[in-house]
């Protein structure tokens, strides 16, 4: 597998530190509000990266954090006159509602920053001892000029960065690009004891600490949105490599933005849509489909029309899978002469899928290979009085490939099928009795439920509209 490494700006063969194992970290949300569509893209993309690596046989240890102490959380808590932890716990719960709805698997570990204050203090103390950080009036700053490789991820020399930076009023740092790893306590804000007095950690040091505590000195893959390249990931590298004296991460993977009318979606611009709001109208799966429908480094434009296109595409997948279930109920045990050739032919779609995913996680081409499989199934299996072996072969390949992408996960077959089949049976009886008005009424009722009927020689088939 090759992945695009932001650090080197080229596609590179993925070679793990330990054969057969992958250690990866993704920056999680700052939990002060509902996540928006832009926040959800890295969730879905790197969920698929983890799924695919496991599909290819790797043992993946995946850490994704919660930033549960931050200026925005404190501000929200003050507005609502509650403790900061009430805000963070509330939105962690809401995060899981959305993540589960999007079929995002929980990471191996989902640590909170506030659970790792001891590790943060240990790293800061070591940075001060080594001369990479300094204390100033209760704050502690990282000295960027002491790290000769500062700017290597964003490919910006330190002198260029300094030219556009300035020290804000009230800051006591030495140089404009120095950043806080510990912030002195302010009245009314949460604080922890430290060698430099009461205070709280800076954002960047939190991720370095959780990386180190749960994954060790060096990890295979660090991932996140392109907006985190600078300063967050740049600062993580500086802190971590100065602390350990070792490379921080071998591969850096960053997903592209979600745009609205070709402008980046963000809370600060007010042009964002929460996952919850969109899901309440369209469901979660169309959102997941949208977020993985383009190669992950490419921008995606969000619009109602595009969401509706995603719904139509998903309906094709659901219709195919539901049709296979119908065929399986009626399939004969005896195999037909050409079955093995058709089943063996399904293997080429797996090969196309793997080829796409091995090329820097190209989900767009991977999805295309699934739709080629669907065309093959619709041509050679559905409605062809297939054998049980042929249908099972088609189902196995369909479920294998869609499963890697986490798609077609809302098949409510048990309750929905029993309801639908009861109505279909009533309609069939009405037709036998030539009660056409009742048969039409039931058909219309099913259509209102989003179910379309199709009369075939094998019986009545249905699919979602």
Model-derived features with residue positions:
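Alpha-helical recognition segments enriched in aromatics with Gly/Pro capping
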Residues: 1-32, 47, 97, 118-325
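N-terminal, positively charged nucleic-acid-binding surface of large information/translation enzymes
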Residues: 8-13, 17-105, 458-462
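Short phosphate-binding/catalytic loops that engage adenosine nucleotides
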Residues: 58, 132, 451
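Short, glycine/charge-rich beta-strand/loop segments that flank catalytic centers
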Residues: 66-70, 92-95, 105-120, 138-147
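The substrate-binding groove and active-site-proximal loops of carbohydrate-active enzymes
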Residues: 78-84, 108-114, 225
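Structural preference for alpha-helix termini/caps and helix-kink/transition segments
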Residues: 264, 271-465
């Amino acid at each position: 597998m090759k992945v695009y490494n932001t650090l080197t700006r080229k596609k590179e063969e993925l070679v793990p530190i330990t054969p057969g194992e992958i250690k990866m970290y993704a920056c999680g949300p700052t939990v002060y509000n509902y996540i928006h569509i832009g926040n959800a893209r890295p969730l879905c993309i790197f969920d698929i990266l983890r799924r695919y690596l496991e599909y290819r046989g790797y043992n993946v240890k995946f850490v994704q954090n919660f930033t549960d102490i931050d200026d925005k959380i404190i501000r929200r808590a003050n507005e609502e006159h509650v403790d900061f932890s009430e805000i963070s716990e509330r939105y962690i719960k809401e995060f899981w509602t959305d993540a589960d709805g999007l079929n995002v698997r929980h990471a191996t570990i989902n640590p909170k920053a506030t659970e790792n204050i001891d590790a943060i203090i240990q790293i800061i103390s070591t940075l001060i001892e080594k001369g990479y950080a300094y204390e100033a009036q209760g704050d502690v700053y990282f000295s960027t000029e002491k790290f000769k490789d500062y700017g290597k991820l964003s490919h910006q020399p330190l002198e260029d960065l300094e030219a556009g930076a300035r020290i804000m009023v009230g800051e006591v740092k030495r140089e404009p690009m120095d950043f806080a790893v510990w912030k002195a306590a302010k009245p009314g804000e949460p604080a922890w004891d430290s060698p430099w007095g009461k205070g709280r950690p800076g954002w960047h040091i939190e991720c370095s600490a959780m990386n180190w505590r749960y994954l060790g000195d060096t990890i295979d893959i660090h991932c996140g949105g392109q907006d985190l390249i600078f300063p967050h990931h740049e600062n993580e590298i500086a802190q971590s490599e100065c602390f350990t004296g070792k490379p921080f991460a071998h591969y850096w993977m960053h997903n592209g933005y979600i745009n609205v009318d070709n402008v980046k979606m963000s809370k600060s611009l007010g042009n964002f849509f929460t996952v919850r709001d969109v899901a309440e109208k369209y469901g979660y799966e169309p959102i997941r489909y949208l977020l993985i429908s383009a190669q992950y480094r490419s921008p995606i434009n969000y619009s109602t029309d595009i969401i509706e296109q995603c719904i139509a595409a998903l309906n094709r997948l659901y219709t195919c899978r539901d049709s296979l279930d119908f065929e399986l109920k009626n399939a004969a045990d005896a195999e037909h002469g050409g079955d093995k050739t058709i089943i063996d032919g399904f293997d080429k779609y797996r090969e196309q899928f793997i080829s796409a995913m091995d090329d820097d996680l190209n989900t767009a081409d991977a999805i295309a290979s699934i739709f080629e499989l669907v065309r093959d199934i619709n041509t050679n299996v559905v409605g062809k009085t297939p054998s049980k072996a042929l249908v099972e072969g088609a189902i196995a390949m369909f479920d294998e490939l869609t499963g890697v992408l986490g798609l077609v996960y809302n098949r409510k077959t048990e309750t929905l099928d029993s309801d639908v089949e009861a109505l279909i049976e009533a309609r069939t009886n009405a037709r036998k009795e030539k009660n056409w008005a009742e048969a039409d009424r039931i058909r219309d009722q099913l259509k209102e439920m989003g179910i379309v009927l199709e009369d075939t020689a094998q019986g009545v088939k249905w699919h979602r509209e």
